[in-house]
Amino acid sequence: MRVLHVCSELYPILKTGGLADVTAALPPALAGFGVDSRVLVPGFPAFINAIKDKQLLINIPSRFGAEEINIFLAKIPNTKIDIYVIDAPSLFARPGNPYADSSNQAYADNYLRFALLGWVAARISEGLDAKWKPEIVHSHDWHAGLVPAYIKASELASGKKAVKTVFTVHNLAYQGLFPMSVFTELDLPGIFLSMNGLEFYGQVSFMKAGLYFADKITTVSPTYAKEIQIYEQGCGLEGLLADRHNDLYGVLNGVDPQIWNPKKDSLIATNYSSTTVATGKAKCKLALQQMMGLAEKEDALLFGIVTRLTEQKGLNLLIEAIGEITSRGGQIVLLGSGDKALEEVFLAAAKKYSKSIAVQIGYDEEQAHRIIAGSDVIMVPSRFEPCGLTQLYGLTYGTLPLVHKVGGLADTIIDSSLENLADGTATGFVFDEFSVESLTLAIRRAFALYNRKTDWKKVRKTAMQQQVTWDSSAEKIYQIYKNLVIENN
């Protein structure tokens, strides 16, 4: 089975969030089921610079404002996976963030940049590469939302049955919204600009295009698949998603054990397993405290936070709960960037409690590994969370997750309540209500359990025994593909 994945990020070449981890890990995981995956990406500088021994597949005349368009085929470095790269310098050759300028303002022509991505995917689905034609095209998030639309448009124009499409929502809150006036530049049928298409409250939505035109929709956890069908989390698209509930699947993301594995992680102070976790984590914790300038206290409960600093991630709650942690002798290490006001608040807290709180603004993949290995608790207090990968990394490293009961967090973490401790299923700390009071109670439970060393070790062992690799999830996605291929024959 041949599957083309269409996305804007791919770890380790280009990453701004968890999307890159998923698009990197899923193709090799699917290979175990006989799926021949290839990936299509925009020619951002990171991709152009990373790929070697590329071959020119085709040159395409000017389109979507790009004067020169070359499609290259190469191997993703250090893998057997093929990658198509759209080299269109006038659209993609820009430094820094792939979506926004140095002032963090989204590029005004993003609609053209990602229209080209979708249009090229449709052409590949029709045989642009004479040696490889996909049976399924799987697009990821709003950047690739037009992929199913262009494939459907081609089917309508030619009268020929098109390949089947799958669209994955990694985060419904980011919808790729543009003024209605840009539609004429997208080269799509006029009938697509309607409620039954791209139109979304007087704008054009790339996310809605993917949700409406794809044959099947997946999102990244069973709970999130339910949540996005109701008003509170549907971001205005709950009606469409509820109508398509029979085509909507919630499939948990997984962890790539080649990258996130305390037994062989070269980025952390020392390697450890579930049998050597006590001494291993103690060394990682000390190294982290030294690196971040915290007091070197082995018995201080260390809370790690690796996140984008946005309101979605529940950082406003955490700010209110800082005193609860420091007053009990706990420590905090935070890595992240985003909202400038939040950055300033956390930096001020680190200055005030310099031996208890350390903050590093920015994103550093290596430091993320060190924080997760060296912390006792990893905090993910998100207001909403489609899946979340950080808590899965925490389980893998024996760093107990403290999470809000929402989305994939609810699907993956079991609270250390008395009954769950008694039956040996607890893996972390879960708070139900999105409030400072509820978060504070979870923090207090973490301190209480930490003081009961035997129980803490049992929960940590259970956490590390959780199966969070891609094996099960890849099989579920393969079954979706398989049913679509059968349906199309």
From Swiss-Prot:
GO terms for cellular component: cytosol. One of its GO terms (biological process) is glycogen biosynthetic process. GO terms for molecular function: alpha-1,4-glucan glucosyltransferase (ADP-glucose donor) activity; alpha-1,4-glucan glucosyltransferase (UDP-glucose donor) activity. ADP-alpha-D-glucose binds at residue 15. Its EC number is 2.4.1.21. It catalyses: [(1->4)-alpha-D-glucosyl](n) + ADP-alpha-D-glucose = [(1->4)-alpha-D-glucosyl](n+1) + ADP + H(+). InterPro entries: Glyco_trans_1, GS/SS, Starch_synth_cat_dom. Keywords: Glycogen biosynthesis, Glycosyltransferase, Transferase. Pfam families: Glyco_transf_5, Glycos_transf_1. Pathway: Glycan biosynthesis; glycogen biosynthesis. It comes from the Bacteria. Synthesizes alpha-1,4-glucan chains using ADP-glucose. HAMAP family: Glycogen_synth. PANTHER family: ALPHA AMYLASE DOMAIN-CONTAINING PROTEIN, GRANULE-BOUND STARCH SYNTHASE 1, CHLOROPLASTIC/AMYLOPLASTIC. Belongs to the glycosyltransferase 1 family. Bacterial/plant glycogen synthase subfamily. This is Glycogen synthase. It comes from Francisella tularensis subsp. holarctica (strain LVS). The gene is glgA.
